[in-house]
Amino acid sequence: MWRVLFLLSGLGGLWMDSNFDSLPVQITVPEKIRSIIKEEIESQVSYKIVIEGKPYTANLMQKNFLSHNFRVYSYNGTGIMKPLDQDFQNFCHYQGYIEGYPKSVAMVSTCTGLRGLLQFENVSYGIEPLESSVGFEHVIYQVKHKKADVSLYNEKDIESRDLSFKLQSIEPQKDFAKYIEMHVVVEKQLYNHMGSGTTVVTQKIFQLIGLTNAIFVSLNITVILSSLELWIDENKIATTGDAKELLHTFLRWKRSYLVLRPHDVAFLLVYREKSNYVGATFQGKMCDANYAGGVLLHPRTISLESLAVILAQLLSLSMGIPYDDINQCQCSAAVCIMNPEAIHFSGVKIFSNCSIEDFAHFISKQKSQCLHNQPRLDPFFKQQAVCGNAKLEAGEECDCGTQQNCFLLGAKCCDTATCRFKAGSNCAEGPCCENCLFMSQERVCRPSFDECDLPEYCNGTSASCPENHFIQTGHPCGPNQWVCIDGVCMNGDKQCMDTFGGEAEFGPTECYSYLNSKTDVSGNCGIGDSGYTQCEADNLQCGKLICKYAGEFLLQIPRATIIYANISGHLCVAVEFASDHEDSHKMWIKDGTSCGSNKVCKNQRCVSSSYLGYDCTTDKCNHRGVCNNKKHCHCSASYLPPDCSVQSDTSPGGSIDSGNFPLVAVPARLPERRHMENVYHSKPMRWPLFLFIPFFIIFCVLIAIMVKVHFQRKKWRTEDYSTDEQPESESEPKG
């Protein structure tokens, strides 16, 4: 059963004046007072930090949560994913406590100064380096909700006991340790919100994972960041819609594109200006490859501390740990982590007795097997390429492993000594590499798997296949009754066959009108807190999936209740799954299924299909192609992009994105100026100005010459006149 996290009260932001007090920023200079060094790394360290005029000692132990082969990935201009060459460290992240305060947690990174969070029982302080400081100055600020009247402990609150410093006391027990390997995807809007830079965004994700690890200490769980993916230029899937819809879309993408990326669970982090939801995941599906994932929505008013609480709650739900019943579940902190209100509280948060019991039950089952695998966590100062380790790293063209491994693999393109291509080779592996050479443009590297999907071709200059493209969402498919949604024809008949087998088809209107109007197990428009949701008349075909069954035998579906009804001569069937059944989503009509003329289903309601944003007209591609998800024409065979207006008998069809054409196709004739402006967004015509300038200069020169000639002629006439008069004057008699 999928679970959606709600913000149960009005969202308040840690930095919003309307909901939070104006908090003063203090300047402090942390002082390192002791440390323990193992293998050239500070495994444990203590800092004295002054807060509000009083010194506190933070005892920290190195906490490594990056896998040994951790990479940050992004996409280049052609849509090919590449690892980023970044200089980051995994040995400078620490976790610990404030000396003298047993209910405290410190999570600090020392990579570039001290950056992190100091949590007391019911108040938190953020610390980070002061930019442009000539000393070791840091800013420290209290994360304080306006409604919370909290402060640091007074001296009387400290337990009367020996407060002598023992670094070894913070060493965690390694018995029964569990590990969650997580792949994180940051979509474009959140990337921009976090700073629009790979380094700053990566550091904030490190902080988020560090804070999350501090929460899971009591369960002896380490969240390992196995890889990070940044969608810098564009999102690879649509990130609109509610949390449930986005979760299903992301999981479909995950199953296609993260198959070869090692991880237990994948999370998509999405920015929303405001949202009533903060995330969604499937409960108890942490180790199920098809459902191990979630989406985390980051409203503008949520701080990084609250975001870590949300992530911890989502991961807990994935491990079968539900929300606490506050009347029966207790913990020693001011608020327990699985309390829905926990995101509104500062300070330490731990798991309740109920959560610990639920976690113990989960790890005792076979479905928790992925948590028992301990990944390699070797410290690294910088990602150094190691030739011969069978991993393609920065600066390498290929790496098939040792010479013996390369021989066994039949790798003949890679020089095992230099990890460079051998002479005459331009690739070593990949869907578009054959015999050490790039495949030609006409070779299909990813065939279409659905009538709404599109094939991709090798581009002749890369061993990789172009990113996946599909017909624009909203395009009609099937017998013009259904529409394409994210590359899949949302065919009602196929939904029925997937649920009830090949002898089922989409039910007639009579079946939907009768069963979905009953508002019970046989038909409804969803399940809410108060029970089944009634279908309004317009929404009858968007509730429970009702199919027409023509088989001779009774249906057999494990852990399911089959509902049969004979309506107007049709044998109509529906199904009811338990809430935690992995196929429970099959009970409902899928979003995007047609429910009338220019209408589709969305969240069990029949709405206008305009929300899909389909704007591809038949004229755009000259009736010889379809628009893809980038709104570019994918032409039929024998026609050329970009607008399918030019015929070529040898063309297999395609688009400027499919790989078998250059990014800007050159047609045999120029398209109309109107089309050129639509495609390239040309600026208003300015060329007459550039032609006018030389003519203006020539004109000015001619004017200058004419003026000069005019005055020269005038001078000549004056001189001639003076010459004629002078002899007459000189002939007059003297005297």
Swiss-Prot record:
- Propeptide residues are 17-174
Domain Peptidase M12B, by residue range, is 178-375
Among its keywords, does the record have Signal? Answer: yes
Q: What tissues has this protein been observed in? A: Expressed specifically in testis.
Query: What does UniProt say on post-translational modification here?
Result: The signal and the metalloprotease domain are cleaved during the epididymal maturation of the spermatozoa.
Return the GO cellular component terms, semicolon-separated.
Answer: plasma membrane
Q: Topology relative to the membrane, per the entry? A: Single-pass type I membrane protein
Give residue ranges on the Cytoplasmic side. 708-735
Q: Which GO terms describe its molecular function?
A: metalloendopeptidase activity
Residues annotated as glycosylated are 76, 122, 220, 353, 459, 566
Where on the chain is Phosphoserine found, per UniProt?
729
All residue ranges annotated as the Disintegrin domain in the record: 384-473
| Covalent S-S links between cysteines | 287-370, 329-354, 331-336, 445-465, 616-627, 621-633, 635-644
Recorded hits in CDD domains, A to Z, give:
ZnMc_adamalysin_II_like
EGF-like domain location: 612-645
What is an annotated GO biological process for this record, any one?
binding of sperm to zona pellucida
Record keywords: DNA damage included? Answer: no
Protein location: Membrane
- Show the SUPFAM superfamilies listed in the entry: Blood coagulation inhibitor (disintegrin), Metalloproteases ('zincins'), catalytic domain
Q: Which residues lie on this side of the membrane: Extracellular?
A: 17-686
Keywords (A to Z) from UniProt: Cell adhesion, Disulfide bond, EGF-like domain, Glycoprotein, Membrane, Phosphoprotein, Signal, Transmembrane, Transmembrane helix
Instruction: Kindly list the residue ranges recorded as spanning the membrane.
Output: 687-707
Q: Which N-terminal stretch is annotated as signal sequence?
A: 1-16
Q: What is known of its domains?
A: A tripeptide motif (FDE) within disintegrin-like domain could be involved in the binding to egg integrin receptor and thus could mediate sperm/egg binding.
Q: What does this protein do?
A: Sperm surface membrane protein that may be involved in sperm-egg plasma membrane adhesion and fusion during fertilization. Could have a direct role in sperm-zona binding or migration of sperm from the uterus into the oviduct. Interactions with egg membrane could be mediated via binding between its disintegrin-like domain to one or more integrins receptors on the egg. This is a non catalytic metalloprotease-like protein.
Q: What is this protein called?
A: Disintegrin and metalloproteinase domain-containing protein 2
Q: Which organism is it from?
A: Macaca fascicularis
